[in-house]
Amino acid sequence: MMKWFAKLILSLSLAVVMAASSAAISFGASNSSLDTHASLVTQLDSAASEAAEGKSAMINESAINSNVTGWKLHGKGRMEVTGEGLRLTSDPQENVMAISETVADDFIYEADVMVTDPQADATLLFRSGEDGWSSYMLQLALGAGVIRLKDASGGEGVLNVERKVEAKPGDIYHLRVKAEGTRLQVYWGQQYEPVIDTEAAAHRTGRLGLHVWNGSALFQNIRVSDMSGNTLEPISSQGLWQPDLKGLKGTGEDGLEAKKVFRNHEADVVLEGDLILNGQGSAGLLFRSNAQGTEGYAAVLQGEGERVRVYLKKADGTILHESRVTYPSQRESRHHLEVKAIGERIQIFVDGYEPAAIDMVDTAFPSGYHGVMASSGIAYFQDVYITPYASYYTEKYRPQYHYSPIRGSASDPNGLVYFEGEYHLFHQDGGQWAHAVSRDLIHWKRLPIALPWNDLGHVWSGSAVADTTNASGLFGSSGGKGLIAYYTSYNPDRHNGNQKIGLAYSTDRGRTWKYSEEHPVVIENPGKTGEDPGGWDFRDPKVVRDEANNRWVMVVSGGDHIRLFTSTNLLNWTLTDQFGYGAYIRGGVWECPDLFQLPVEGSKKRKWVLMISTGANPNTQGSDAEYFIGDLTPEGKFINDNPAGTVLKTDWGKEYYASMSFSDMPDGRRIMLAWMTNWDYPFSFPTTGWKGQLSIPRQVSLKETEEGIRMHQTPIEELAQLRSPVLTSPTARWGTSGENLLKGITSGAYEIEAELELPPTGAASEFGFRLREGDGQRTLVGYRAAGSKMFVDRSASGMTDFSDLFSTLHEAPLKPEGNRIKLRILVDESSVEVFGNDGRVVFSDVIFPDPASRGMSFYSEGGKVKVVSLQVHALQHIWREDEAKEPRVVMDTETLELSLGQTKPLFASIDNGQGKGADGI
């Protein structure tokens, strides 16, 4: 639903401001009537500002949702700010133009347009001169029933392309044009595909503007592509800056630096941004600066051939330090620059490489403003974010050692691959592939979006592999090796997205990704026939190497089955099997398949594992995860060891979806992780500023059991580096009802390892752990002897009412081994993961306790249990590992408003207390 806001604050031409009460008017996205608002518009028009020919309009631009500024009127007519937007009204049979001061070369320019007179034309002007006539025009002509892309100069042989549309006065329509070089693309409404796609070279740069002929039109939400981020308004600017498709374009020339300083003022800060250097120029991020940008620090990238070097400079150009090494840089590489300025320590990271390019101590500038700068040549800035360190990964429910995005969302993990010493993690974020890298699977560094939307559509889930022998032929100029990503192309304009498998590749260790021009689509939708491109479910490709048959195998979800393909060159794929259908279907749609081969421990057998996730369905209490064990034939067919209907659950909790394993692991391990959500409530969790977290990475193995070969999962060994000991039970002891072996220990992120034995007589009927306890809150992880059931009960875990479908009790059968049960429990600020009997049974659940609910206890009911061993480890924060672990009081709420005489109990606990929380503060 579009909303046009009427702010009754109008500026007169004499700069006298008339203030009135605020109001808001909301229109539908299309076919909305203007009649009900006519009286208000008339009232507003009577007080609206008008501009004379060629003069700047004294208008309140804040009343318009626009980042295009500095409007001047040309032609015959008037320009007004109304409660619904910017109104242009021409004299009869005349032209009127509003030309802005905003200049752009390559961009997306768009607006919502309402033509109020049936005979009028309304236009977006772009790449215009000052008078508006040396320009391109994107025109909505109601009388002719067309949208028209034309060169304003007219005449024979110049640009003039039309498309028929249905439009009428008083309705709102969205116009959008993308200009990149000589290519011009026009979009109508919310369509993904352009209705006009043409070439024109007459105008390559210029101003943005608006135009109306023979009547009146309203313009609102007038936007041009620009830098994303959380920067506040600039307080100073020098040099040339303009919006661009790539973000904010800065040009430093003739010895004059381009600088833009924003109002964000911080001392300890994490500052990050993406930038593109043009050739051998230099550009960077200003931090702890004065308002003019003449004092403070600058983290600078300097081009050196096909490399870049990092410098820490003072704002006056004095070099404080330079990186010992240089980093790869291709033409149009989008470099990610991250500055951590904490106290006297300054660290600068580039493109996720570790260690830091610069790590030093300096005391010259303890705090200040932040900004961007280009000191020579052209640079483009995008996604610039300034985060006070006190707020960095400290929000309510923010995980401490699980991967979660700093902002935006994380859903399906994609493209997990190891290559040249780094683990690459991609994940879905709004139909794009977000990207992070790690050297240990624990500590992650963010990189720019790897695979954004493209001409084919959105970029949904998929996988990546390392082509180390140049089997694809894509890496002849990059040392004969590189990375290939296979993704689901989804076009919103076509039936069911016309899902097909696209290809992208990287020749620089995953930092820069290119959509293949020679092989943009490697497998078309299987429903394609004749002119019909196909609308079948066909998504989530996962590619794995099959060494025994010297080939690669791809599995793709088909909704109620999995399609298998094989290839010897990673480009040409042959369908070999369709597995599933019928009795295999027990719940929702099949998605996100994975396929890999593992040895069976203690034998010479090797088996193939096919994993899937299933969408939300009442039969499975929402979404679910399961796997099949079998063989892969030389013909490329998967043969299941078990009959259809035999369900092998990957996870017994309710938040483990779209699991994927890493490709090309150097040590033979099979490691996987998943998105911790459920499709009954995928984005409903009560977090602010970010959505979604991933499970801890887990090593997968196959073992013989009394039921047959089954998959086991254990936390990866790398997690041990985060541990600090809290409690170790030196000898076995009996746990009885009423005794708490964990009394006084508090933590929000920790690990419990326990081995518990049921005696032959007098055994407890139930035992386990109460986790994240406080003020009546707790999550139970326990075992019931009757029925041999391990369980997680989160009914009192904290916030649970964000969805009616959020289930609270999860159980799994687990028989004791030698009368013993092993539990390994990993607790974080908003999750609990439980591994029973060395990972034979696994639970993954999210929880949302109050921050102060940090207690823990051991309990037993109806008898006794022998505590053979018990260890508790605090787990270090992976994003703030360098901060001092000083004791602090954690409250259950940060802000509270009370009426006079009202009272409310507050709860608190100690974090990082003496004895790791066991001894108080």
Swiss-Prot record:
Keywords: Carbohydrate metabolism, Glycosidase, Hydrolase, Secreted, Signal. Belongs to the glycosyl hydrolase 32 family. It catalyses: Random hydrolysis of (2->6)-beta-D-fructofuranosidic linkages in (2->6)-beta-D-fructans (levans) containing more than 3 fructose units. This is Levanase. Its EC number is 3.2.1.65. The lineage of its organism: Bacteria, Bacillati, Bacillota, Bacilli, Bacillales. The keyword Methyltransferase does not apply. Substrate binds at S409, A410, S411, D412, Q428, W460, S461, R539, D540, E591, W679. The active site is at D412.
